[in-house]
Structures are given as structure tokens and as C-alpha cells.
A protein has these predicted regions:
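Structural signal for interior beta-strand "rungs" in well-ordered beta-sheet cores
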Residues: 1-143
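Terminal amphipathic alpha-helical/low-complexity segments used for targeting or macromolecular assembly
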Residues: 9, 15, 26-27, 39, ...
């Protein structure tokens, strides 16, 4: 259904519902949109809804994503590239998911939450606050479980970048500081290391607060 813009090479399996009206009770039939990039896989029973005029009016999905069976992408979500939604993972309205993020099976993401690039949410996680890039989280509600080191290695992160990311994680999560204090301590190094700046910028702009 639409209006929907679908890129090339996408694969839709049986019973997937793509571009349907959203389930937001404020929706009154406005001509909102779904935009899908290239080479995504939507497995059986996956549902993706269009946006609402209360937000940007569109749901946006990038390229090379895998949405396993019975996953759900609600209205106004913005999904990056190369993400994986394992079976039953659900993103509520207005959620943003960064590139290469992975949601384990039956993960539930609260409205307006942002999940950073390369983050990993363990199966059954309930995500109520923003998840910074590179983090692993698990539980209901979810808590931090370290850095997604193996995923970063597979994507070409070198030992120096990994070391700086680990140090930043300790600064935010292990020293008993406030978020503001941790960001101040990381400011100088973040200006020199792009991978670290992605981490600190995300935290500084987290409107819901971060998982801690």
C-alpha cells in the first residue's frame, strides 16, 4: 500500500504488510509516506507502517537490512543501513535505529528511542532509553553489557579505535560520574578520534537519556 517508494532488489516474503496505514489513533487518513532503499529483506509477517503528519510524515528504511518474521516497524521510524531485526523484534513509533545495529528476537523498543550505530540489543530486551553507538544491552528494562567488540572487528575497526571506545565506555559507565562529567572528560579526545565523536555526540543529543 502507499504512497510508498521502494528501491531496487528488495525481497518481500509471504504475508508481509508494507506501507499500510499506521496504528496511531491520531491518524485520520492523511497521505503520508513510506520510503524504502535497496536490497532489503522483509520476511514472513513483517509489518511496516507509513508516517504521521505529527512527525515527518514518512517512515524511512535504508538499504541492506534484514527484517525477520513477525517484526514490526511503526510509523515515523527511521532505520539506517545493514541493520538486523531478529524474529519478533518491534520498533514503536518515531524510533531511530543507526547503521549496523542488531535487535535480538522479541526486542521491544519504546516510542521515540534512538539506538546508535553498531549497537546490539540481546533477545527479549525492553529498550526504554537511548542506546549509544557500539553498546551491547540486554534485559527488561535493558542495561549495558559492554562494547560490541566482535561486531566492530568484523566491520574493520582497528585496535586503536577499539581501545578509545572501551576507554570512553569506562568513562561513562564505570567511574560513577554524571553524563555531563563524562562528556567533559572525553571532549578533547573525541575531537581527535571520529569513532569516539560518534559516541559522544549521540550521548550529548540523547533526548530520552541513555541506558545506564
Amino acid at each position: 500500500k502507499g504512497p510508498s517508494t521502494i528501491g531496487k532488489g528488495n525481497h518481500f516474503f509471504q504475508f508481509a504488510s508494507i506501507g499500510e496505514d499506521c496504528q496511531d489513533k491520531k491518524y485520520k487518513g492523511e497521505a503520508t509516506e513510506l520510503i524504502v532503499g535497496d536490497y532489503n529483506v522483509f520476511r514472513e509477517g513483517c509489518s511496516v507502517h507509513r508516517g504521521t503528519i505529527q512527525d515527518q510524515g514518512k517512515t524511512i528504511i535504508g538499504s541492506h537490512n534484514l527484517f525477520m518474521n513477525t517484526t514490526h516497524i511503526a510509523h515515523d521510524c527511521v532505520i539506517g543501513d545493514h541493520t538486523i531485526f531478529a524474529s519478533g523484534a518491534q520498533a514503536a513509533g518515531h524510533v531511530h535505529i543507526g547503521d549496523w545495529a542488531i535487535l535480538g528476537g522479541m526486542t521491544g523498543v519504546h516510542q521515540f528511542v534512538h539506538i546508535g550505530a553498531h549497537a546490539f540489543c540481546g533477545g527479549g530486551s525492553i529498550v526504554l532509553k537511548d542506546v549509544p553507538p557500539y553498546l551491547m544491552v540486554h534485559g527488561a528494562p535493558c542495561v549495558p553489557a559492554g562494547i560490541n567488540t566482535e561486531g566492530l572487528k568484523r566491520r574493520g575497526y582497528d585496535s586503536e579505535a577499539l581501545l578509545e571506545i572501551r576507554r570512553a565506555y569506562k568513562e561513562v559507565y564505570r567511574k560513577g560520574q554524571t553524563v555531563a562529567e563524562a562528556l567533559a572528560a572525553l571532549e578533547e579526545k573525541a575531537a581527535q578520534v571520529p569513532e569516539l565523536k560518534l559516541f559522544t555526540d549521540f550521548i550529548a543529543n540523547a533526548s530520552r537519556g541513555i541506558v545506564r
